[in-house]
Amino acid sequence: MLDEGRYFKGKEEVKKLLDEMARLKMNTFHWHLTDDQGWRIEIKKYPLLTKIGGKRDSTQIGNWNSNIYDGKVHEGFYTQEEIKEIIDYAAKRQITIVPEIEMPGHASTAIAAYPQLGTEKQSIKVPTRFGVQYHAYNVADPKVIQFIKDVLDEVC
C-alpha cells in the first residue's frame, strides 16, 4: 500500500515503486488516494476536492500524539489523465491497481471542500494532525449518497 492521502509522492515515484513491485513479482498495488489529510485524485464534478483538499498548511511530525509541526505546505494531486497513465504503466507490468477512496469516515478533506457533506455541516480546514478525526460523511443525506456515487463513477 502507498499512502498518498497523507503524503503525496507524484507520478515518477509511483512508477519507480511499480517497477520494483514488478521486479519482485508483486501483482497488486493498493493505492490510498484520500484521507483526512489529503485528497489526491481529480474529480471533475467536484473541483474543490483537489483545490482545497489537495493541500494542507503543515504536517505533524513525530508520533501521532506530537504537538510539533513542520510549518510547510504539503500539496499535490493526480489528474485523471495521470491516473490513466499510471494504470497503463502498471498493467504493462502485470500489476493491478486497487484505488482506495475513504468513506464514510476519514472524510475531512472532502468536508473541508464541501461542508454540506458532513454530519455537522460546519466549515473545517484540512487537518494537519494525524490520528483520529471525527468528521464523517452524512450518509443519511441523499445528496451525500449522490456525491459518493459521482466520485466512484469518476474513479471507476
Region roles according to the model:
Residues 37-92, 109-142:
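Aromatic- and acidic-residue-enriched carbohydrate-binding clefts of CAZyme catalytic domains
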Residues 6, 33-37, 45, 101-107, ...:
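Active-site-proximal loop/turn and secondary-structure-junction residues that shape catalytic pockets
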Residues 3-36:
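A conserved hydrophobic secondary-structure block that centers on an alpha-helix together
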Residues 9-14, 77-82, 146-150:
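Short, glycine/acidic-rich beta->alpha junctions
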Residues 1-13, 134-143:
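Active-site mouth loops of central-metabolism enzymes
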Residues 7-8, 29, 77, 130, ...:
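Phenylalanine-focused residue identity feature
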Residues 24-29, 83-104, 135-156:
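An active-site-proximal structural segment forming one wall of the substrate-binding cleft
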Residues 31-32, 50, 54-57, 98-100:
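Non-cysteine beta-strand/loop elements that form the S-adenosyl-L-methionine
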